[in-house]
Each structure stands twice: as structure tokens, then as C-alpha cells.
Amino acid sequence: MLKKIIIGIVLVLVLIQFIPLDKSNPKVDESISLHTDENIMKILKKSCYDCHSNETKWSIYSKIAPLSFKIHSNVKIGRAALNFSNWKDIKQDIKIARLKRAIKTVNNKMMPLSAYLSLHEEARMSSDERKILVKWLENELRLIAPDEVYF
């Protein structure tokens, strides 16, 4: 009986490898993507772009189910929440809300996700990088909505 269960589990794990997931990156239109200070871009690309842009670097383990399902879902959710590749196309009221949320999540060390950091230690932000990024996010917020109270 135990042998049949193990064979069944192995069979399921093999079969789910054939479930297709779109791991391509949509084309990046440079005219609408984020362009800002080089230091900010360096932090964003290191710590945020895999989930929050159309420039995801799909790792080898992102092709292995069931882990691939979770990674694909996280990228899809991340892009929907805030996509730096579509920065200039985001409506102002939505951008304000997303900037506020980004400030909160970066300040509270909720981003990058701990599961992501466990596999990508290089994406971890130093406290200085976190402060620099939050300051930039706050400045972006002030630029697009100077009369609004944020914090």
C-alpha cells in the first residue's frame, strides 16, 4: 500500500511538470518604463524588478513544479501591484496608492518577500538602501501629489 502511495505521488509530481505556465516577459517599452537616478535604479533592479517589472529573471527552479506555480503567481501579483515597466502609464490616483503601499512595505521590511530572499540573498536591501529607496518613494509621491498628507 505504501509503495502505491509513493508511486502515485511521484507520478503526480512528474505529470505536473507538463502543466504549461507562461514564463515569458512582456516586451518593455522604454518610453513608459521607469527612468530615474542610477543609484535608485540599482536598488530597484537588485531587490524589486524580478517581481515588479517585465524584466523578470526566471531562475532554473522557476521551471520545476510545484514551486513554479508559486513563483509564477508571485510575479503575476507583483506586476499587478506595481510594475516599473509601465510606470508612466499608471494613472495618478493609482500611482499615489501604490507609492504609499510601497513606502509601507519597504519600511516594514515586508519587501522583498522573505521567501524570495531565502533564494536570492543578493536581493536583500541594507538599511541604508532601504532608507534611500523610501526617501525616493516619498519624493515621487510629493512630486505627483504635493498637497496630499501621506504619513
What are these regions (language model features)?
Residues K109-M110, L117, E121-E148:
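C-terminal capping alpha-helices of c-type cytochrome domains
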Residues M1-L34, L137-F151:
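Post-cleavage N-terminal segment of exported redox proteins
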Residues F69-L119:
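Extracytoplasmic electron-transfer domains, predominantly the class I c-type cytochrome c fold
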Residues E38, K42, D93, A123-D128:
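Soluble non-cytosolic domains of exported or imported proteins
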Residues L44-E55, M111, L133:
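The canonical Cys-X-X-Cys-His
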Residues L13, S24-H35, F84-D89, S114-L119:
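Sequence context of c-type cytochrome heme-c attachment sites
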Residues H35-Y49, I71:
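Sequence/structural segment immediately N-terminal to covalent heme-attachment motifs in c-type
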Residues I60-P66:
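Short cysteine/histidine-rich zinc-coordinating motifs and their immediately flanking basic loops
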